[in-house]
Protein backbone atom coordinates (compact mmCIF):
# COMPACT_ATOMS: atom_id res chain seq x y z
CA UNK A 1 0.00 0.00 0.00
CA UNK A 2 1.41 3.38 -1.05
CA UNK A 3 1.11 6.18 1.52
CA UNK A 4 0.03 9.49 0.02
CA UNK A 5 2.75 12.08 0.35
CA UNK A 6 2.21 15.40 2.10
CA UNK A 7 2.26 18.39 -0.25
CA UNK A 8 4.36 21.09 1.42
CA UNK A 9 2.58 23.76 -0.63
CA UNK A 10 -0.42 23.19 1.64
CA UNK A 11 1.42 24.73 4.63
CA UNK A 12 1.90 28.36 5.61
CA UNK A 13 4.90 29.09 7.86
CA UNK A 14 3.08 28.12 11.07
CA UNK A 15 1.79 24.89 9.54
CA UNK A 16 5.18 24.07 8.03
CA UNK A 17 6.97 24.48 11.36
CA UNK A 18 4.34 22.37 13.11
CA UNK A 19 4.69 19.61 10.52
CA UNK A 20 8.48 19.62 10.76
CA UNK A 21 8.31 19.37 14.56
CA UNK A 22 5.54 16.78 14.85
CA UNK A 23 6.17 14.55 11.83
CA UNK A 24 9.85 14.97 11.06
CA UNK A 25 11.31 15.78 14.48
CA UNK A 26 13.05 18.85 13.05
CA UNK A 27 13.52 22.37 14.35
CA UNK A 28 11.68 25.43 13.05
CA UNK A 29 14.67 26.84 11.18
CA UNK A 30 14.72 23.75 8.95
CA UNK A 31 11.12 24.40 7.95
CA UNK A 32 12.08 28.00 7.18
CA UNK A 33 14.98 26.85 5.01
CA UNK A 34 12.71 24.59 2.98
CA UNK A 35 10.10 27.34 2.54
CA UNK A 36 12.80 29.63 1.20
CA UNK A 37 13.91 27.01 -1.32
CA UNK A 38 10.33 26.49 -2.47
CA UNK A 39 9.23 30.10 -2.84
CA UNK A 40 12.42 32.12 -3.34
CA UNK A 41 14.15 29.70 -5.69
CA UNK A 42 11.23 27.77 -7.18
CA UNK A 43 12.73 24.42 -6.19
CA UNK A 44 10.51 21.32 -6.21
CA UNK A 45 13.26 18.68 -5.88
CA UNK A 46 14.59 18.12 -2.36
CA UNK A 47 17.97 16.99 -3.75
CA UNK A 48 18.53 20.55 -5.00
CA UNK A 49 18.21 22.02 -1.50
CA UNK A 50 21.94 22.16 -0.96
CA UNK A 51 21.99 23.48 2.63
CA UNK A 52 19.68 20.70 3.86
CA UNK A 53 21.50 17.66 5.26
CA UNK A 54 21.17 14.34 3.45
CA UNK A 55 19.24 12.64 6.26
CA UNK A 56 16.52 15.30 6.23
CA UNK A 57 16.39 15.31 2.44
CA UNK A 58 15.77 11.56 2.53
CA UNK A 59 12.97 12.00 5.09
CA UNK A 60 11.40 14.69 2.95
CA UNK A 61 11.59 12.55 -0.18
CA UNK A 62 9.94 9.66 1.67
CA UNK A 63 7.08 11.62 3.24
CA UNK A 64 6.63 14.81 1.24
CA UNK A 65 6.27 16.36 -2.18
CA UNK A 66 6.15 19.84 -3.70
CA UNK A 67 3.33 19.59 -6.19
CA UNK A 68 1.90 22.67 -7.92
CA UNK A 69 -0.73 22.82 -10.66
CA UNK A 70 0.71 22.12 -14.10
CA UNK A 71 0.07 24.07 -17.29
CA UNK A 72 -2.38 22.23 -19.53
CA UNK A 73 -2.57 25.05 -22.07
CA UNK A 74 -1.17 28.56 -22.52
CA UNK A 75 -2.66 31.34 -24.63
CA UNK A 76 -0.79 34.55 -25.38
CA UNK A 77 -2.61 37.82 -26.06
CA UNK A 78 -1.38 40.50 -28.43
CA UNK A 79 -1.10 42.86 -25.43
CA UNK A 80 1.24 40.52 -23.52
CA UNK A 81 -1.40 38.95 -21.29
CA UNK A 82 -1.03 35.20 -20.78
CA UNK A 83 -3.88 32.88 -19.83
CA UNK A 84 -2.99 29.47 -18.48
CA UNK A 85 -5.34 26.55 -18.06
CA UNK A 86 -3.81 24.93 -14.99
CA UNK A 87 -4.51 21.33 -14.14
CA UNK A 88 -5.64 20.71 -10.55
CA UNK A 89 -6.22 16.99 -10.12
CA UNK A 90 -8.44 15.90 -13.00
CA UNK A 91 -9.88 19.39 -13.53
CA UNK A 92 -8.61 22.75 -14.77
CA UNK A 93 -8.74 26.34 -13.56
CA UNK A 94 -7.62 29.49 -15.33
CA UNK A 95 -4.86 31.84 -14.19
CA UNK A 96 -4.08 35.11 -15.96
CA UNK A 97 -0.78 37.03 -16.04
CA UNK A 98 -1.06 40.74 -16.85
CA UNK A 99 2.26 42.54 -17.42
CA UNK A 100 2.52 46.33 -17.30
CA UNK A 101 5.42 48.77 -17.26
CA UNK A 102 5.50 49.13 -13.48
CA UNK A 103 3.96 45.86 -12.30
CA UNK A 104 3.16 42.26 -13.14
CA UNK A 105 -0.23 41.13 -11.87
CA UNK A 106 -1.44 37.56 -11.52
CA UNK A 107 -5.17 36.85 -11.43
CA UNK A 108 -5.68 33.69 -9.36
CA UNK A 109 -8.64 31.29 -9.08
CA UNK A 110 -9.98 30.05 -5.74
CA UNK A 111 -12.53 27.44 -6.89
CA UNK A 112 -13.24 25.12 -9.78
CA UNK A 113 -16.30 26.92 -11.11
CA UNK A 114 -18.42 29.16 -8.90
CA UNK A 115 -21.57 28.75 -6.80
CA UNK A 116 -22.86 32.30 -7.07
CA UNK A 117 -24.49 32.28 -10.52
CA UNK A 118 -23.89 35.95 -11.38
CA UNK A 119 -25.81 36.39 -14.62
CA UNK A 120 -23.12 38.32 -16.51
CA UNK A 121 -20.12 36.12 -15.65
CA UNK A 122 -19.05 33.27 -17.92
CA UNK A 123 -17.63 31.22 -15.04
CA UNK A 124 -21.19 30.89 -13.72
CA UNK A 125 -21.97 28.70 -16.75
CA UNK A 126 -19.71 26.03 -15.32
CA UNK A 127 -21.47 25.82 -11.97
CA UNK A 128 -19.58 24.89 -8.82
CA UNK A 129 -17.32 21.84 -8.70
CA UNK A 130 -15.09 22.22 -5.65
CA UNK A 131 -12.89 24.46 -3.55
CA UNK A 132 -9.20 24.61 -4.38
CA UNK A 133 -6.68 23.44 -1.79
CA UNK A 134 -4.03 25.79 -0.39
CA UNK A 135 -1.48 24.11 -2.66
CA UNK A 136 -3.71 24.69 -5.68
CA UNK A 137 -4.17 28.39 -4.91
CA UNK A 138 -0.59 29.28 -3.97
CA UNK A 139 0.59 26.75 -6.55
CA UNK A 140 -0.82 28.94 -9.32
CA UNK A 141 1.51 31.72 -8.16
CA UNK A 142 4.43 29.31 -7.84
CA UNK A 143 3.85 27.85 -11.30
CA UNK A 144 3.37 31.26 -12.93
CA UNK A 145 6.65 32.50 -11.43
CA UNK A 146 8.42 29.47 -12.90
CA UNK A 147 6.79 30.02 -16.30
CA UNK A 148 7.63 33.74 -16.42
CA UNK A 149 11.15 33.36 -15.07
CA UNK A 150 12.41 33.53 -11.51
CA UNK A 151 14.03 36.70 -10.19
CA UNK A 152 17.44 35.05 -10.01
CA UNK A 153 17.13 34.36 -13.75
CA UNK A 154 15.68 37.66 -14.97
CA UNK A 155 16.77 40.21 -12.35
CA UNK A 156 13.18 41.30 -11.70
CA UNK A 157 10.27 39.96 -9.68
CA UNK A 158 8.10 37.79 -11.94
CA UNK A 159 4.95 38.75 -9.99
CA UNK A 160 4.47 41.99 -8.06
CA UNK A 161 0.70 41.88 -7.49
CA UNK A 162 -1.85 39.12 -6.93
CA UNK A 163 -5.59 39.59 -7.33
CA UNK A 164 -8.01 36.91 -6.17
CA UNK A 165 -10.34 37.64 -9.07
CA UNK A 166 -10.13 34.42 -11.05
CA UNK A 167 -12.66 31.60 -11.09
CA UNK A 168 -14.74 31.26 -7.93
CA UNK A 169 -15.75 33.31 -4.89
CA UNK A 170 -12.71 33.48 -2.58
CA UNK A 171 -14.69 34.01 0.61
CA UNK A 172 -16.55 30.74 0.12
CA UNK A 173 -13.17 29.00 0.49
CA UNK A 174 -11.88 30.66 3.64
CA UNK A 175 -10.21 27.54 5.04
CA UNK A 176 -7.76 27.46 2.13
CA UNK A 177 -7.74 31.14 1.16
CA UNK A 178 -6.26 32.44 4.43
CA UNK A 179 -3.14 30.19 4.47
CA UNK A 180 -2.56 30.91 0.78
CA UNK A 181 -2.70 34.66 1.46
CA UNK A 182 -0.31 34.21 4.40
CA UNK A 183 2.23 32.57 2.07
CA UNK A 184 1.87 35.40 -0.47
CA UNK A 185 2.65 37.95 2.26
CA UNK A 186 5.30 35.99 4.18
CA UNK A 187 8.93 36.99 3.67
CA UNK A 188 9.73 33.28 3.42
CA UNK A 189 6.99 32.96 0.82
CA UNK A 190 6.50 35.45 -2.00
CA UNK A 191 6.99 38.49 0.26
CA UNK A 192 4.34 40.64 -1.40
CA UNK A 193 3.12 43.85 0.18
CA UNK A 194 -0.35 43.59 1.72
CA UNK A 195 -1.35 46.50 -0.51
CA UNK A 196 -0.41 44.41 -3.55
CA UNK A 197 -2.56 41.40 -2.67
CA UNK A 198 -6.25 41.96 -3.40
CA UNK A 199 -9.22 39.81 -2.48
CA UNK A 200 -12.43 40.44 -4.40
CA UNK A 201 -15.80 39.34 -3.07
CA UNK A 202 -19.34 39.42 -4.43
CA UNK A 203 -20.74 39.93 -0.96
CA UNK A 204 -20.11 36.95 1.33
CA UNK A 205 -20.59 38.91 4.55
CA UNK A 206 -19.83 35.98 6.86
CA UNK A 207 -16.46 35.47 5.17
CA UNK A 208 -15.57 39.15 5.18
CA UNK A 209 -16.37 39.38 8.88
CA UNK A 210 -14.18 36.32 9.44
CA UNK A 211 -11.30 38.07 7.64
CA UNK A 212 -11.67 41.23 9.73
CA UNK A 213 -8.79 41.44 12.18
CA UNK A 214 -7.39 38.12 10.92
CA UNK A 215 -5.58 39.06 7.73
CA UNK A 216 -4.97 42.46 6.18
CA UNK A 217 -5.02 42.70 2.39
CA UNK A 218 -6.52 45.06 -0.17
CA UNK A 219 -10.27 44.60 -0.64
CA UNK A 220 -12.32 44.92 -3.81
CA UNK A 221 -16.07 44.42 -3.87
CA UNK A 222 -18.15 43.28 -6.83
CA UNK A 223 -21.19 45.55 -6.57
CA UNK A 224 -22.48 45.94 -10.14
CA UNK A 225 -25.83 47.52 -9.22
CA UNK A 226 -26.91 50.55 -7.16
CA UNK A 227 -30.05 49.03 -5.61
CA UNK A 228 -31.24 45.70 -4.23
CA UNK A 229 -33.88 45.05 -6.86
CA UNK A 230 -31.46 45.21 -9.77
CA UNK A 231 -28.61 43.55 -7.90
CA UNK A 232 -30.77 40.57 -6.96
CA UNK A 233 -31.69 40.14 -10.62
CA UNK A 234 -28.10 39.90 -11.80
CA UNK A 235 -26.41 38.66 -8.59
CA UNK A 236 -28.54 36.15 -6.63
CA UNK A 237 -26.20 36.39 -3.61
CA UNK A 238 -27.92 39.71 -2.89
CA UNK A 239 -30.94 37.72 -1.67
CA UNK A 240 -28.73 36.34 1.12
CA UNK A 241 -26.93 39.57 2.04
CA UNK A 242 -28.38 42.79 0.70
CA UNK A 243 -26.36 45.85 -0.25
CA UNK A 244 -26.59 47.56 3.14
CA UNK A 245 -25.47 44.40 4.98
CA UNK A 246 -22.62 44.06 2.50
CA UNK A 247 -21.44 47.66 2.79
CA UNK A 248 -21.64 47.55 6.59
CA UNK A 249 -19.27 44.57 6.60
CA UNK A 250 -16.99 46.39 4.15
CA UNK A 251 -16.78 49.39 6.49
CA UNK A 252 -15.93 47.09 9.39
CA UNK A 253 -13.11 45.51 7.40
CA UNK A 254 -11.50 48.69 6.11
CA UNK A 255 -11.71 50.25 9.59
CA UNK A 256 -9.40 47.49 10.84
CA UNK A 257 -7.15 47.48 7.75
CA UNK A 258 -3.93 49.28 6.93
CA UNK A 259 -3.71 47.79 3.45
CA UNK A 260 -6.78 49.66 2.20
CA UNK A 261 -5.79 53.09 3.53
CA UNK A 262 -9.38 53.70 4.55
CA UNK A 263 -10.90 53.02 1.11
CA UNK A 264 -12.40 50.05 -0.68
CA UNK A 265 -12.30 49.45 -4.43
CA UNK A 266 -15.80 49.12 -5.89
CA UNK A 267 -16.02 47.06 -9.07
CA UNK A 268 -18.97 47.86 -11.32
CA UNK A 269 -19.44 45.98 -14.59
CA UNK A 270 -21.28 48.18 -17.08
CA UNK A 271 -24.01 46.24 -18.92
CA UNK A 272 -25.57 48.06 -21.85
CA UNK A 273 -29.02 49.43 -20.92
CA UNK A 274 -29.13 47.26 -17.78
CA UNK A 275 -27.18 49.10 -15.07
CA UNK A 276 -25.55 51.95 -16.99
CA UNK A 277 -28.22 54.68 -17.11
CA UNK A 278 -27.41 58.09 -15.67
CA UNK A 279 -30.02 57.46 -12.97
CA UNK A 280 -28.02 54.38 -12.00
CA UNK A 281 -24.87 56.51 -11.79
CA UNK A 282 -26.55 59.05 -9.52
CA UNK A 283 -28.01 56.27 -7.38
CA UNK A 284 -24.58 54.63 -7.09
CA UNK A 285 -22.99 57.93 -6.10
CA UNK A 286 -25.57 58.40 -3.36
CA UNK A 287 -25.25 54.79 -2.20
CA UNK A 288 -21.48 55.04 -1.71
CA UNK A 289 -21.38 58.43 0.02
CA UNK A 290 -20.89 56.86 3.47
CA UNK A 291 -18.36 54.24 2.35
CA UNK A 292 -14.95 55.70 1.39
CA UNK A 293 -14.12 54.19 -1.96
CA UNK A 294 -12.69 54.40 -5.43
CA UNK A 295 -14.99 53.15 -8.17
CA UNK A 296 -13.61 51.00 -10.97
CA UNK A 297 -15.94 50.81 -13.97
CA UNK A 298 -15.53 47.65 -16.03
CA UNK A 299 -17.03 47.67 -19.53
CA UNK A 300 -18.67 44.28 -20.05
CA UNK A 301 -16.55 41.75 -21.92
CA UNK A 302 -18.87 39.73 -24.20
CA UNK A 303 -18.61 35.94 -24.37
CA UNK A 304 -20.50 33.41 -26.52
CA UNK A 305 -24.11 32.98 -25.46
CA UNK A 306 -24.24 36.02 -23.21
CA UNK A 307 -27.45 38.10 -23.33
CA UNK A 308 -25.54 41.24 -22.35
CA UNK A 309 -23.61 43.77 -24.41
CA UNK A 310 -20.83 46.27 -23.80
CA UNK A 311 -22.11 49.87 -23.59
CA UNK A 312 -20.99 52.43 -26.13
CA UNK A 313 -17.98 54.55 -25.25
CA UNK A 314 -20.25 57.59 -24.92
CA UNK A 315 -22.44 55.83 -22.31
CA UNK A 316 -19.35 54.72 -20.39
CA UNK A 317 -17.97 58.26 -20.48
CA UNK A 318 -21.26 59.80 -19.29
CA UNK A 319 -21.55 57.29 -16.46
CA UNK A 320 -18.03 58.09 -15.27
CA UNK A 321 -18.53 61.85 -15.47
CA UNK A 322 -21.82 61.66 -13.57
CA UNK A 323 -20.11 59.82 -10.71
CA UNK A 324 -17.25 62.31 -10.70
CA UNK A 325 -19.73 65.16 -10.28
CA UNK A 326 -20.37 63.67 -6.83
CA UNK A 327 -16.63 63.86 -6.07
CA UNK A 328 -16.01 60.13 -6.30
CA UNK A 329 -12.68 58.82 -7.60
CA UNK A 330 -13.62 56.89 -10.73
CA UNK A 331 -11.52 54.90 -13.19
CA UNK A 332 -12.44 52.83 -16.24
CA UNK A 333 -10.61 49.53 -16.34
CA UNK A 334 -8.52 48.96 -19.42
CA UNK A 335 -9.54 45.67 -21.00
CA UNK A 336 -6.65 43.23 -21.16
CA UNK A 337 -6.51 39.81 -22.80
CA UNK A 338 -9.98 39.93 -24.33
CA UNK A 339 -8.68 38.33 -27.53
CA UNK A 340 -7.95 35.15 -25.54
CA UNK A 341 -11.03 35.38 -23.28
CA UNK A 342 -8.86 36.36 -20.32
CA UNK A 343 -10.64 39.63 -19.52
CA UNK A 344 -12.81 40.23 -16.48
CA UNK A 345 -15.86 37.97 -16.47
CA UNK A 346 -14.59 35.76 -19.29
CA UNK A 347 -12.70 33.14 -17.29
CA UNK A 348 -14.10 29.83 -18.32
CA UNK A 349 -12.99 29.27 -21.91
CA UNK A 350 -11.96 25.73 -22.74
CA UNK A 351 -11.99 24.83 -19.05
CA UNK A 352 -15.77 24.40 -19.04
CA UNK A 353 -15.55 21.65 -21.64
CA UNK A 354 -12.82 19.73 -19.83
CA UNK A 355 -14.57 20.15 -16.48
CA UNK A 356 -17.94 18.99 -17.74
CA UNK A 357 -16.33 15.76 -18.88
CA UNK A 358 -15.52 14.97 -15.24
CA UNK A 359 -18.72 16.32 -13.70
CA UNK A 360 -20.68 13.07 -13.87
CA UNK A 361 -17.81 11.18 -12.28
CA UNK A 362 -17.52 13.74 -9.49
CA UNK A 363 -21.27 13.59 -8.86
CA UNK A 364 -21.08 9.83 -8.54
CA UNK A 365 -18.30 10.19 -5.97
CA UNK A 366 -20.25 12.76 -3.97
CA UNK A 367 -18.99 16.13 -5.18
CA UNK A 368 -18.40 19.03 -2.81
CA UNK A 369 -21.29 21.50 -2.66
CA UNK A 370 -21.82 24.95 -1.21
CA UNK A 371 -25.21 26.21 -0.06
CA UNK A 372 -24.79 29.99 -0.10
CA UNK A 373 -27.94 30.51 1.97
CA UNK A 374 -26.45 28.40 4.74
CA UNK A 375 -23.11 30.21 4.88
From Swiss-Prot:
InterPro entries to which the protein is assigned, alphabetical: Aldolase_TIM (IPR013785), Methyltransferase_A (IPR040072), RlmN_N (IPR048641), RNA_MTrfase_RlmN (IPR027492), rRNA_lsu_MTrfase_RlmN/Cfr (IPR004383), rSAM (IPR007197)
Active site residues per record: 94, 344
GO cellular component: cytoplasm
Paired cysteines (S-S): 107-344
GO molecular-function term, one example from the UniProt record: rRNA binding
Binding sites annotated in the UniProt record for S-adenosyl-L-methionine: 168-169, 200, 222-224, 301
Top-level taxon: Bacteria
Enzyme category, top tier: transferase
Residues annotated to bind [4Fe-4S] cluster: 114, 118, 121
PROSITE patterns associated with the record: RADICAL_SAM
NCBIfam families found in the cross-reference section: PRK11194.1, rRNA_mod_RlmN
Function: Specifically methylates position 2 of adenine 2503 in 23S rRNA and position 2 of adenine 37 in tRNAs. m2A2503 modification seems to play a crucial role in the proofreading step occurring at the peptidyl transferase center and thus would serve to optimize ribosomal fidelity.
Protein name per the record: Dual-specificity RNA methyltransferase RlmN
Gene name of the encoded protein: rlmN
Amino acid sequence: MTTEKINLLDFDRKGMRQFFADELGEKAFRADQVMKWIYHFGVDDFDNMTNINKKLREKLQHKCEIKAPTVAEAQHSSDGTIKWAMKVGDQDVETVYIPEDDRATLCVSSQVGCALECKFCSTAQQGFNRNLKVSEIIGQVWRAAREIGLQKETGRRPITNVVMMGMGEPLLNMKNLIPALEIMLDDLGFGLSKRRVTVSTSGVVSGLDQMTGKIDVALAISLHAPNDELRSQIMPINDRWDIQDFLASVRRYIASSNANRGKVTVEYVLLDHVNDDMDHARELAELMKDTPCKINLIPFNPYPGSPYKKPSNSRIDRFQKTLMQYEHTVTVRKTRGDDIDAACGQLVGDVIDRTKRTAALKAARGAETIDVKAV
